[in-house]
């Protein structure tokens, strides 16, 4: 017998930083880890959320709402949205992209499931809840760029730099976010398509990032430095690609401003 379920996005997550974040979720009788696996009873739930009732298998229901909860927990732990690169897509769908709709689908042989991108994983690595320490967690890194440059190399963009910081740094992440049609700016609801590219910080405090999967259009690079205490420092660069050729005029002005401060 079909079961009617009315549900309205029973989860919400937001992280101000590595020290402050929230995640709310609501439980119910149809949600369980076992519900992510094949259902021998083939239960169908008639689910109403933003539209009229539509049929969900028990597995799909748990994928969407447990996956959604974990996605929102990621926000509570200060993870932003991101999208799998072409190479990463072999692993499935990025959890902090649309991975809430694919979570544990591989258990039912319905797809590749979801995964944490390298960028998300490295940010969690130093989050106080995972590192097990709050030492210096409230201290400000006071990051400075001693060198910063960006340029195109064939079908990729290379970002290089040298930094210094009062809190040790472990990695630099470039969120490459294209401005979509009818999009205003690069606000949180418009960043699901931001691919991420990571460089560890060398012993000489240098980084070297190569961004691929280039597309025509206006772009924002959010250059995020990850510090050992869980903190992040963000700088923004903007560029345009037209017919495969990148224009860094605005980015170079922004680099000059970043380097001067």
Where are these regions (language model features)?
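Active-site-proximal segment of zinc-dependent metalloprotease catalytic domains
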Residues: 1-77, 81-83
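Intrinsically disordered, low-complexity N-terminal regions enriched in serine/proline/glycine
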Residues: 7, 185, 191, 238-240
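Compositionally biased regions
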Residues: 7-10, 166, 260
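Serine/threonine-rich low-complexity intrinsically disordered regions
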Residues: 27, 39, 118, 193, ...
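Extended interaction regions within the primary functional domain
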Residues: 28-30, 34, 180, 188-190, ...
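General N-terminal targeting signals
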Residues: 40-42, 113, 238
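Short beta-strand elements
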Residues: 229-261
